[in-house]
Amino acid sequence: MKVFKQQLEQLGAQNQYRSIPDLIHQGRYITRENCKMLNMSSNDYLGLASDENLRRSFLQQYGGNFPSFTSSSSRLLTGNFPIYTDLEELVAQRFQRESALLFNSGYHANLGILPALTTTKSLILADKFVHASMIDGIRLSRCAFFRYRHNDYEHLKNLLEKNVGKFDRTFIVTESVFSMDGDVADLKQLVQLKKQFPNTYLYVDEAHAIGVYGQNGLGIAERDNLIAEIDLLVGTFGKALASVGAYAVCNQVLKECLINQMRPLIFSTALPPFNVAWTYFIFERLPQFSKERSHLEQLSAFLRREVAHRTQIMPSQTCIVPYILGGNEATLAKAEYLQRQGYYCLPIRPPTVPKGTSRIRLSLTADMTMDEVRQFAACL
């Protein structure tokens, strides 16, 4: 055990030690150590997770005869239920795509898709700032990969040109809204690049965009009218949609390849039908949350201006607002100060973000008021 203790001590010395907090949730507030704080770190972007009216409407439709609380098996064995197919058909129909496939989480999706769709003769080109789950999926793919500079499409084009004809297929991998900086990929440029090179596919993770952007809440791809041009459009139900699980929209051939070759799908017990039914209930109503999306954008624009005024650094264009302080100690101290003021703010440190860019990742939700955000900004 000595070697493990030394590792933990080293993390502590670098201000990188992590622990799981004891929390009590009360709507948009969190209580920790008897201190009630406004939650400024949630991914519940539309504020649906604590909406009691939604929850009541969902439960009432069953009259006590609820869907099963467990699937007890992989979908490929005995764990498939009609609600799974219903949700996949609804997702595909809303995106106006041929197929959709469900996964247990966004991590499961990103871990398994690339290994299932690549060979040792394939190439993956990923944005430098893609999520850790995508990096893990790339590593498991056992094929060549390069990471292009963040949102640097000239660099990506150079990599594509250098590798023309060398690989059986190429995947360009990006997030649409990046989880730490809150900035947005230029999907139009990525689609144009993809079309210039043979056997090249575009894989976009919309985890932080689904529900929040687009006329119907379908993400940045919908906002930019590019849904049909993206080969794999992945998103999660665990953030703005207040549920659990994830999806990919794609063509039928890719769906069948994933069903046959994606290990996290094949070898995992499927999500409980009860949870999938709740996801269906929320996803069906996604176009109705336009007021929440509009209000969230107003809150976000205000806080982005306030933080930029103080730091002169603001990469974000979304409701993820990074308050970049640089060093670990300063970031930890600021987070503790804001918590004492009644705001649950969390420090983000390396290796989650690059060295020297430690920050407080501020995350706004549509159930906050402008007065609450103004009062918070005054504490910065």
Swiss-Prot record:
MF GO annotations: 8-amino-7-oxononanoate synthase activity; pyridoxal phosphate binding
Catalysis performed (reactions): 6-carboxyhexanoyl-[ACP] + L-alanine + H(+) = (8S)-8-amino-7-oxononanoate + holo-[ACP] + CO2
Modification N6-(pyridoxal phosphate)lysine occurs at: 239
EC number: 2.3.1.47
Family stated for the protein in its record: Belongs to the class-II pyridoxal-phosphate-dependent aminotransferase family. BioF subfamily.
Keywords: Biotin biosynthesis, Pyridoxal phosphate, Transferase
Function: Catalyzes the decarboxylative condensation of pimeloyl-[acyl-carrier protein] and L-alanine to produce 8-amino-7-oxononanoate (AON), [acyl-carrier protein], and carbon dioxide.
Residues annotated as binding substrate: 18, 131, 352
Pathway(s) served: Cofactor biosynthesis; biotin biosynthesis
Quaternary data: Homodimer.
Highest taxon of source: Bacteria
Xref: InterPro entries: Aminotrans_II_pyridoxalP_BS (IPR001917), Aminotransferase_I/II_large (IPR004839), AON_synthase_class-II (IPR050087), AONS_Archaea/Proteobacteria (IPR004723), PyrdxlP-dep_Trfase (IPR015424), PyrdxlP-dep_Trfase_major (IPR015421), PyrdxlP-dep_Trfase_small (IPR015422)
Protein name as catalogued: Putative 8-amino-7-oxononanoate synthase
Cofactor: pyridoxal 5'-phosphate
Gene Ontology biological process terms, A to Z: biotin biosynthetic process
Residue numbers binding pyridoxal 5'-phosphate: 106-107, 179, 205-208, 236-239
